[in-house]
């Protein structure tokens, strides 16, 4: 069976779309619906009328699980040790509420 998942985005540009969201949605579908073997996923940007699409197959889901479990392991380690190293992103300057962070452009 084939499943379709769409995440509607209100951002102004699809230029920096995070396809990781599509991967996680596909893994969620595979976990909850054993009869689904293909997921067609999309990020639909409603403001700029752009769409980012990808297709995922159950047969290759183990590769995606390895990727995401590795990322989760890093988060779990940070939580266990209460060490949260700051990382810069495009949101730091205008949107971060952590004023004491070295990457916050408003401090």
Region spans (language model):
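RecB-family 4Fe-4S metal-dependent nuclease core
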Residues: 1-107
């Amino acid at each position: 069976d084939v499943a379709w998942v769409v995440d509607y985005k209100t951002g102004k540009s699809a230029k920096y779309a995070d396809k990781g969201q599509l991967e996680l949605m596909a893994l969620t579908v595979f976990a909850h619906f054993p009869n689904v073997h293909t997921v067609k996923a999309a990020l639909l940007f409603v403001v700029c009328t752009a769409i980012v699409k990808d297709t995922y197959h159950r047969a290759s889901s183990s590769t995606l699980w390895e990727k995401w479990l590795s990322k989760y392991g890093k988060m779990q380690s940070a939580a266990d040790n209460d060490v949260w190293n700051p990382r810069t992103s495009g949101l730091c300057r205008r949107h971060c509420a952590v004023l004491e962070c070295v990457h916050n452009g408003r401090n």
